[in-house]
Structure formats: structure tokens, C-alpha cells
């Protein structure tokens, strides 16, 4: 059963579809599916492994649970608003839903075998609801969400990587180890504190507990003529603490300077004049 769209803002809700129109839309999808079965020569539902239903002007799709062995489904470049037709397609491995008008992806958690999911160019708004629906997909490796309203949130990419650690290719870009380390620091403060404590032999302030910058509102871009020192992307934050924290996370190296004791003669060396008594030197260590 599809989620009640009343939880969405009025301007973002999908338009109500009259019963007759919905029935007609389902009939159109049924006809398109039957045509595909004839083209491929399938006589039994058990023989269907793939369905190509893109660019059919579909607004609704009939229930596809009859195709138990369906593995590949193309539904891109249609006019779909939701996904309520994939409830028992447990073998589905690749699903192409890009270039539609999808507001809600409720129902995708029924697809445990899915490893490729394309959802770019849709109308997804709620990032938390989207992530919640995708969390159970342990086999998901490739995901696209770009050109959706939810992509406008700050740290959107790191948020997805944190909650979907199995994803290797996000929005056509490989997930890097640097991104994985960054998302741990930003969203898993306890684990980050343990990692730093091990790295610095327990010499880390136990009170360190930064706030999650993801709770802030979407960043606002200031006019191009607004300039201030050392500001690169000109992203404005509602809370100064968030700005300070995000800025600190962008530092790629840390330098530690101390006295090089190898250049300082001992008392005995001074007495025996075995070592040049020149000025002591400083030693700089850079950590990355």
C-alpha cells in the first residue's frame, strides 16, 4: 500500500488521479508488458528475466509479482510518481527508474537482491525517508540520486555514504577512502573518537563531541561580489559552530614543531668539546 502523500508539502504532492484515469493508466502498462512478452517470445511468466518499458509515457504500472524470476527492469523516461508494483520480485538485480516524477520510493526495501539502482532526475525530497528505504539493501553497489531536490542538502553525499556503506559508485563517482573517513568523523563521533584515541595513544580530549552539521538548513549562496578572507566556496551556515567544524575538517595536514635534541650537545660533549656548539635546530613533523 502506498504511503499517504499528505506528509509532503502541498506544492510537492503528486496530483490526485481519478479512478477511471488510474484504471486506464494500468491498462496502458498491461498492454505495453504484453507487447514486450510477444516481442521476446515469452509464453510463461517464469521465463521472463527482463522487461524493457522505458519511454512508454507510463504513469502507473500493474503489479509485477507474477514475474518471479525478473532480474532486469527498465522504466526510465516515463511519468511515474511512486513504486508500488514491486512487492515480490525478490530476484530483481538492476532497476532503472531515472527520468520520472517519483516522489516516494516506498516499496524498494522488498528487493534484497538489487545491486544497481538509478533514481536520478526525479522529485525525491525527503532524504531521511529515502535512506531508510534503501538501508536494507545489503547488495546495493551502484546508486544515482543526482538531479533530485534532496541533493541540495549540505553533506548529502557523505550522509548517503555513511548510511549505505555498501555503495561503491554514487552518482557516477567512485566512493573514495577519504570520503569514508570523513563521514565517520562527521556522523559517527564515538567511532571517530576511538580512532583518534588509538592514533594519538589516548591523548585525545574525551569531551570532544562535535555537532552534526547535517542538521543545518541547506546552505545559502551569497552574491559573487560578497568577499571575505579565506572563503573558497562562500557557503553560509546558520550556526557559526557548524562553519568552524566543517572548516576544520577540510584541513589535510597537521604540522608539529619541536626542538631537535640531536643538535644539542650533552654536558659531557660540551666539556670534551667533541661536538660543535652551534645553535640548536627545530624539527617539523607533518601528519596527514
Swiss-Prot record:
Pfam families: LRR_9. Keywords: Leucine-rich repeat, Repeat. LRR repeats lie at residues 47-68, 69-90, 91-112, 113-134. This is Leucine-rich repeat-containing protein 72. It comes from the Eukaryota. PANTHER family: LEUCINE-RICH REPEAT-CONTAINING PROTEIN 72. Residues 148-186 form the LRRCT domain. It comes from Bos taurus. InterPro entries: Leu-rich_rpt, LRC72, LRR_dom_sf.
Amino acid at each position: 500500500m502506498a504511503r499517504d502523500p499528505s506528509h509532503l508539502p502541498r506544492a510537492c504532492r503528486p496530483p490526485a488521479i481519478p479512478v477511471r484515469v488510474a484504471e486506464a493508466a494500468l491498462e496502458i502498462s498491461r498492454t505495453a508488458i504484453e507487447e514486450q512478452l510477444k516481442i521476446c517470445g515469452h509464453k510463461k511468466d517464469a521465463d521472463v528475466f527482463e522487461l524493457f518499458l522505458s519511454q512508454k509515457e507510463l504513469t502507473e504500472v500493474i503489479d509485477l509479482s507474477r514475474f518471479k524470476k525478473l532480474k532486469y527492469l527498465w522504466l526510465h523516461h516515463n511519468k511515474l510518481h511512486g513504486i508500488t508494483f514491486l512487492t515480490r520480485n525478490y530476484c530483481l538485480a538492476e532497476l532503472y527508474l531515472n527520468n520520472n516524477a517519483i516522489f516516494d520510493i516506498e516499496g524498494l526495501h522488498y528487493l534484497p537482491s538489487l545491486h544497481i539502482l538509478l533514481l536520478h532526475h526525479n522529485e525525491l525530497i525527503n532524504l531521511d525517508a529515502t535512506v531508510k528505504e534503501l538501508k536494507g539493501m545489503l547488495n546495493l553497489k551502484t546508486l544515482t540520486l543526482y538531479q533530485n531536490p534532496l541533493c541540495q542538502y549540505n553533506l548529502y553525499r557523505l550522509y548517503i555514504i555513511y548510511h549505505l556503506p555498501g555503495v561503491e559508485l554514487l552518482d557516477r563517482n567512485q566512493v573514495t577512502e577519504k570520503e569514508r573517513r570523513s563521514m565517520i568523523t562527521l556522523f559517527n563521533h564515538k567511532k571517530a573518537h576511538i580512532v583518534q584515541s588509538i592514533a594519538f595513544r589516548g591523548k585525545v580530549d574525551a569531551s570532544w563531541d562535535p555537532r552534526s552539521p547535517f542538521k543545518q538548513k541547506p546552505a545559502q549562496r551569497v552574491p559573487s561580489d560578497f568577499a571575505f578572507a579565506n572563503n573558497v566556496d562562500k557557503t553560509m551556515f546558520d550556526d557559526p559552530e557548524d562553519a568552524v567544524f566543517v572548516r576544520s575538517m577540510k584541513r589535510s595536514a597537521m604540522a608539529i614543531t619541536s626542538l631537535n635534541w640531536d643538535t644539542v650537545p650533552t654536558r659531557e660533549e660540551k666539556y670534551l668539546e667533541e661536538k660543535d656548539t652551534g645553535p640548536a635546530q627545530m624539527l617539523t613533523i607533518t601528519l596527514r
